[in-house]
């Protein structure tokens, strides 16, 4: 039994593409960045905490279970861009991303309670130059409101991406190849 410790519909959709049956549970954790924590360490810590929280929360569901936690952050010049609090916050983020290359880090952890496997995937994403009116129009679609970095590559925000180097599915929220490899190591995946 696999538990996806996430309420993200994007992660659930991606995980279903691997072909492994799973159940979703919410993993409520404190997502505050710790002082001196790099973006890479931060995203890996959150993925691990989510997996552990999912494993603990699913104790009544199945004895033999794995829990998968994942987290994705958008980073530019070593600064993590989270989900925007309001339009001004989203505008600032999108202005910073405008015409620039940034990184998207996605970490995935799978735990069986006593065993833990983790991966970190880095993807470079380059944006076109954005005008103020493009940013305002994009905000009005509602899409940026709950997205790290204020954009969704799989949605309307994809039209701003001029180049991607790495895993598209990792930018969406779950790197398929790497997740399948983790599941294989934990004996639950379909082989390539």
UniProtKB/Swiss-Prot annotation:
Keywords: Cytoplasm, Hydrolase, Nucleotide metabolism. InterPro entries: ITPase-like_fam (IPR029001), Maf-like (IPR003697). One of its GO terms (biological process) is nucleotide metabolic process. HAMAP family: Maf (MF_00528). The record marks 10, 72, 154 as: Important for substrate specificity. PANTHER family: BIFUNCTIONAL DTTP/UTP PYROPHOSPHATASE/METHYLTRANSFERASE PROTEIN-RELATED, BIFUNCTIONAL DTTP_UTP PYROPHOSPHATASE_METHYLTRANSFERASE PROTEIN-RELATED. Its cofactor is a divalent metal cation. It is found in: Cytoplasm. Signal peptide: none annotated. Its main location: cytoplasm. The keyword Cytoplasm applies. NCBIfam families: maf. One of its GO terms (molecular function) is dTTP diphosphatase activity. One of its GO terms (cellular component) is cytoplasm. Nucleoside triphosphate pyrophosphatase that hydrolyzes dTTP and UTP. May have a dual role in cell division arrest and in preventing the incorporation of modified nucleotides into cellular nucleic acids. The active site is at 71 (proton acceptor). It catalyses: dTTP + H2O = dTMP + diphosphate + H(+); UTP + H2O = UMP + diphosphate + H(+). The lineage of its organism: Bacteria, Pseudomonadati, Pseudomonadota, Gammaproteobacteria, Alteromonadales. This is dTTP/UTP pyrophosphatase. Belongs to the Maf family. YhdE subfamily. Pfam families: Maf. Its EC number is 3.6.1.9.
């Amino acid at each position: 039994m696999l538990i996806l410790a996430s309420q993200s519909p994007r992660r659930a959709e991606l995980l279903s593409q691997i072909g492994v049956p799973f159940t979703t549970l919410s993993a409520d954790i404190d997502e505050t960045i710790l002082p001196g924590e790099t973006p890479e360490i931060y995203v890996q810590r959150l993925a691990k905490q989510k997996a552990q929280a999912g494993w603990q929360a699913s104790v009544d569901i199945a004895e033999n279970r794995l829990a998968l936690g994942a987290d994705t952050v958008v980073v530019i010049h070593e600064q993590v861009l989270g989900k925007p609090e309001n339009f001004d916050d989203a505008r600032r983020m999108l202005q910073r991303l405008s015409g620039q290359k940034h990184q998207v880090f996605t970490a995935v952890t799978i735990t069986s309670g006593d065993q833990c496997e983790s991966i970190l995937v880095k993807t470079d994403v380059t944006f076109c130059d954005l005008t103020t009116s493009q940013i305002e129009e994009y905000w009005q679609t509602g899409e940026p409101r709950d997205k790290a970095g204020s954009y969704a590559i799989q949605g309307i925000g994809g039209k701003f991406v001029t180049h991607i180097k790495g895993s598209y599915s990792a930018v969406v929220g779950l790197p398929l190849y790497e997740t399948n490899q983790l599941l294989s190591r934990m004996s639950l995946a379909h082989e390539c």
